[in-house]
Amino acid sequence: MLRVFGSLTRSRSSSVLSQDDKIKQILKQAHDFEIALQAMDYVLDDRAEEGLALLKKNEAEDGSDQTINVLARGVIEFLEATLGFEAEEMKKASETLAKAENLSLKSRQYAQKNDLKSSSLYAPGTVYAVTYTESCLLHALLMIFSESYVETAKALLKLRKAYYMLQEIFEEMKKVKQTNGNMSIYKSETNHSEASVDSSNASFSSVDIPYELTREESNNSLYQESAEKVQKMRVRRLTGSHIGNTPAIDRLRSELGLDGPKVTTEENSNEYSALSENMDFSQATIDEFIHSGVNLCYGILQVVLSLLPSGIGAVLSVVGFHGSREDGLRLVWRATKQRNIHGCIGLLGLMFYYDGPFQFTDADFDIPVPENELKKTKSSSTYEEGDLDGPTLLHPGKILEDALLQSRALFPHSALWLLNEATMLSGQGRLRDSVKLMDSIEADKIEMRQVKSLLIFNRALTLVHLHEYERAADDFLSLLDISSWSHSLYHYFAGSCYLEIYRMHQLGVRKSDRPEHFKQRATDLIFGAPNLLTRKSFNARPLPLDRFMLRKVDQFKATQKRLKLSDPLDAIATSPVHELQYFYNGYNRMGKQDLELANIMLTEYHNPAIDAKEPNQEMIKDFLVSLTYRRLDRAEEGCELLDRNVLPKIFTMVNGKVKYFKKTEDPWLYPSALYERSLFSWKLKHMDGLEESKEWLTRAQGYADDYELSTRVEMKIKAAIDRVDESL
């Protein structure tokens, strides 16, 4: 095959391309895109080295498409960076994606200049417009994930470039659909059992060549051999057999969990058995890449824009740069229907949106979509037959489960998809099932170090929600040898776990045979954590949670000095592990017994710092206790506690207007308390409380400030406001 594609290429320095040159380059381009898609799938199966080796081998070939090779490497590095959030990995991914941006613009210009049309539906160079926007988007997301106002502002300039180009391509896609009489452009009418290469009578046609061949061209054996190769690569990729795994259909389960039943199939499976009846085997590789790439990138971009703080969003809207959360989610869902990297990244993005730490869809904010909103959904500019309606977009339930289970079947070696299944189980309150699933894989055998560290970190969090603190601390400390993300936070989190073990022993809730050991470990780790703080973050500044940790330890030291305490642990009032749990959605994931234990530890434990009743520490304690009440079906008590002990210290009403008391001790608390108060209004009054909920959310949004967790808190507030607005 190297001989075939070597003879099918020619130097791009040529000023004029013949028809023969064009066919050769078109087929080589389709081949290189299939190679790139295969390489990225290796990564999704926890075999990154195999994927990178495949790209390296292809890059060395004469006439190889460097643009898609570099983008594929950038996507692999992006996944590694966003899974681990390590400074060096994020820097490396950013540099590669920047290179992919430049190459994409050059390749697009080359295709346009030479009228090199590689798609039967779109203008020359369109596929490189997609690679450009994908590079820009992923690069900008790395900047946004820094959770910094400044970096977010810089990212917006990059997103703006991608936005207008994506908008242009998306409008072209709609025109193509209308021209084809509203027939789907994503699935052709060709029966998938028929190869798109017909070699009968020594002639052929190929969906990857976007125009009709002459008799001489259709008899060209080199064209035919390369076209057949591309078609076989595509079929193997679509069925999941391209990376050497046994038939995915044999591993497909119908339910989540380690013991979930398998899907029964009537026919004997083979390596070409598809997981979905909607699989299109006859769509050209370049067209598939364009469709899935635009749906993914334009969809993610719209969701991100819809979640930006209102101040930034309002400015962007003036210049026509705005996003729709519903339209964006619908496009991302559409991308997941494609069996390629775009579909998988789309699914990972949806998992982050529905079950991630930012709580974009809070379990307590289960507002139904009104009838008029369903009609609006169908009239949306992005809506197509077969898309998800409003309620399903908000709570996809089984549809999201099934999509994840398909990825679990396709990529059996990957701890990444196993981790996402565990996260989904946690989101359903099945914490022990989640830990059991994560324990089923041997961490040391996970090839991708970032996935290994992420799985251990998430297992530690789940164990914290279960109050299994000793094992959680062990997991946090084990990360010191695996991940460079935040050694200071790992120490602080582990120390907070040991402190809670010591407190439970003191209170008699759970006796320990080594209380003094845990006490000393808590002291060493909590107060020693700032010493590990380095400036290794992507943007040369401490990470948000590092700054949070540093502020907390400074508070503890100040309290110890003020109260003249000999034991530094006596200077810690509200349990730091319960405070940390709020940032990781812990109170929405705990079961009844776990919530009751959290309530006991927050309300019944005493030490000198707690008895001193420092106002801000009392606010944190009462805030967290109110959440346990709400989740324990004692919402009235929780709301009363919040109204009486927390909110009056945050704001007051003067002549009908809100006057905030700007506080700096724990800046995450104040807007979060206003946000949670809106959920109490919904929980207690349901639809009758929506106006009141909106009022509380507006107040939460008004308490804007640039603090260590501002991006996380404000995105959550913005998502809730949009959700309420849809139902008012």
UniProtKB/Swiss-Prot annotation:
Supply the alphabetized keyword list: Cytoplasm, Nucleus, Phosphoprotein
Q: Does the keyword tRNA processing apply?
A: no
Any one cellular-component term (Gene Ontology) = cytosol
Q: Which Pfam families is this protein grouped with?
A: Iml2-TPR_39
Q: Where in the cell is it found?
A: Cytoplasm; Nucleus
InterPro entries hit by this protein: Iml2/TPR_39, TPR-like_helical_dom_sf
Q: Does the keyword Transmembrane apply?
A: no
Quaternary structure and partners: Interacts with lipid droplet proteins.
The record's comment on protein family reads: Belongs to the IML2 family.
Give a short account of what the protein does: Inclusion body (IB) resident protein that interacts strongly with lipid droplet (LD) proteins. Involved in LD-mediated IB clearing after protein folding stress, probably by enabling access to the IBs of an LD-stored soluble sterol derivative that acts as a chaperone in inclusion clearing.
Put simply, this protein is called Inclusion body clearance protein IML2
What species does this protein belong to? Vanderwaltozyma polyspora (strain ATCC 22028 / DSM 70294 / BCRC 21397 / CBS 2163 / NBRC 10782 / NRRL Y-8283 / UCD 57-17) (Kluyveromyces polysporus)
Q: Which gene encodes it?
A: IML2
